[in-house]
Regions:
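Active-site capping/gating regions of soluble enzymes
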Residues: 23-25, 32-41, 46-164, 168, ...
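Core alpha/beta catalytic barrel or barrel-like domain that forms the active/cofactor pocket
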Residues: 171-179, 197-216, 236-256, 286-307, ...
Length: 499
């Protein structure tokens, strides 16, 4: 068979912006060295997924050929800003076609491109993929080379720079609950969907009856999926610690050993993405939606464990002498500051309408009050461990939260306490309850101090995204009858498939 010899022009000027990384000095020495190693690895790769986390914590990507990625590695790749502008249901929440999108980013006018620059330290070849595929995370930049003000990963990197300047390094551990279900059909869910309206949620069946917490026999019913998934996660280098069966039917908890904060956020994005892909390829559906509309579902949470290490000595700042659960003065200052900032930043830990169902009083193991206690799972902050293992577990998060923003919010708030920042007034008794709806949380976010962490543009953008989401939900509720104690059809369509 004769094959026409197509003659491509140079890729160097056809993707991204030539010499973008070098011209703007975007990489440190570690990344420059890693980029050379990545170029060598491309000989063993067919395709590369260039990925960034959107404001909702979902992985957005372009799949490039290995040859194209050689240029992208140092030029960056042009991306549409759409993922910054759509809410969870793909409704346009930021008016990018008007003269002023209203978030303070001029480059959004007309939906102009931004530049996604691969972080060569995150490059890895995915196991058992044909064609041979690599995954690499990107940092987002404006076209003039400045960090994109709507970048979630950029927010976390700024917070970590503050810790580094003080000789400190946060350590973060992940405990993530999610649902494993069996798909009943292969319908794509495109009936009646569009901008601002998600299609039908996946039709699924439960894996077991549930409600035998940690029962070994129940784990056996999910082990044909979770055991090979565990091996896949280990092949990816993730520091997996355990797979456990929780209370709900097919409800899984996956835990990881402590990591650096940026590694933890990157790991969470990769873990959720790979888990959904792995299960889908085997006729199952994994969902990180907190409270899916499944018979007898128990809501899922994301417990975020955190401590702070002094770089020079390796000392855990939270460590104190005394009985189990005691905390050092630094640890108490960190915890108190988390409480002081809790309402302002709560929406970053529980960002969906559905996530607040878990925080209702009748879910006894979910936190309902803003407070901290030693070894008490009803509190927002649970103080755990002693000595070098002393840490704070924040129990309010939902599993689908944006990992960069959730982790950044915790570390930023805690740092204000470590730095001796003035705390706000103690909450009045009626304010000790955690927010009970996304609307409540959004109003606290809108009126609060979030811009000190996020900057004005991202604060404005998230406000628009969440206002669009909650308004669509409220409109649906006004037009449809539903029980307030039940997950609605709107929530199931909005979150169960995508998350």
């Amino acid at each position: 068979m004769r094959i026409r010899p197509w003659t491509p022009l140079s890729e160097q000027g056809s993707v991204g912006r030539p010499s973008f990384v070098a011209d703007h000095e975007l990489w440190d020495d570690d990344r420059l060295a890693a980029a050379d190693r990545v170029e060598a690895e491309l000989a063993h790769v067919d395709l590369v997924r260039l990925v960034f986390g959107d404001p909702h914590g979902l992985a957005r990507s372009k799949t490039l050929t290995a040859d194209a990625f050689r240029a992208v590695l140092r030029n960056g790749m042009n991306f549409s800003p759409g993922p910054f502008l759509f809410d969870t249901g793909h409704a346009v929440a930021v008016d990018f076609l008007g003269d002023d999108p209203g978030v303070g980013v001029d480059e959004l006018v007309g939906a102009g491109n931004f530049v996604a620059v691969p972080d060569p330290l995150t490059f890895q070849i995915l196991p058992d993929r044909a064609p041979r595929t690599a995954w690499v995370l990107a940092d987002e930049y404006l076209r003039d080379g400045t960090p994109h003000p709507l970048s979630s990963r950029g927010v976390l990197r700024r917070v970590l720079a503050e810790y580094e300047s003080r000789g400190l390094a946060p350590a973060v551990g992940l405990e993530v609950e999610w649902y494993l279900t069996r798909r009943l059909d292969d319908e794509p869910g495109n009936t009646g969907n569009g901008f601002g309206l998600q299609g039908q949620a996946p039709r699924v069946a439960a894996m077991n009856a549930g409600y035998q917490f940690n029962l070994d026999a129940q784990y056996d019913t999910i082990a044909p999926l979770t055991d090979p998934l565990a091996l896949r996660l280990l092949e990816l280098g993730l520091p997996l610690r355990s797979m456990e069966h929780e209370s709900g039917p097919g409800q899984v908890e996956t835990t990881f050993s402590p990591m650096t904060a940026l590694d933890a956020a990157d790991a969470m994005l990769l873990f959720r993405t790979v888990t959904k892909q792995f299960c889908a390829a085997r006729g199952h559906h994994a969902s990180f939606m907190s409270h899916p509309a499944l018979d007898s579902a128990d809501p899922s949470g994301w417990h975020l464990n955190q401590s702070v290490i002094e770089r020079a000595t390796g000392r855990n700042l939270f460590e104190a002498e005394g009985p189990s659960g005691s905390m050092s003065p630094e640890g108490k200052a960190y915890a108190d500051s988390l409480l002081d900032w809790a309402r302002d930043l709560f929406m970053l830990s529980v960002p969906t309408v559905n996530g607040y169902r878990r925080l209702a009083a009748h879910h006894t193991l979910a936190p309902t009050r803003i407070g901290w206690r030693v070894e008490d799972r009803s509190a927002m902050l649970r103080i755990v461990g002693t000595g070098a293992g002393a840490h704070i577990e924040n129990r309010v998060g939902e599993p689908c939260a944006n990992p960069y923003l959730n982790i950044a919010a915790q570390l930023f708030a805690g740092l204000q306490g470590l730095a001796g920042g003035a705390a706000g007034d103690a909450p009045a008794p009626g304010e000790l309850l955690v927010p009970q709806s996304l609307r409540q949380s959004l109003e606290a976010f809108r009126a609060g101090r979030a811009a000190q962490l996020l900057g004005t543009p991202l604060t404005a953008c998230l406000t628009k995204l969440k206002e669009s989401e909650v308004s669509r939900y409220e409109t649906w509720c006004a037009q449809n009858s539903s029980r307030p104690d039940r997950t609605t059809q709107w929530e199931q369509r909005e979150y169960f498939g995508a998350y």
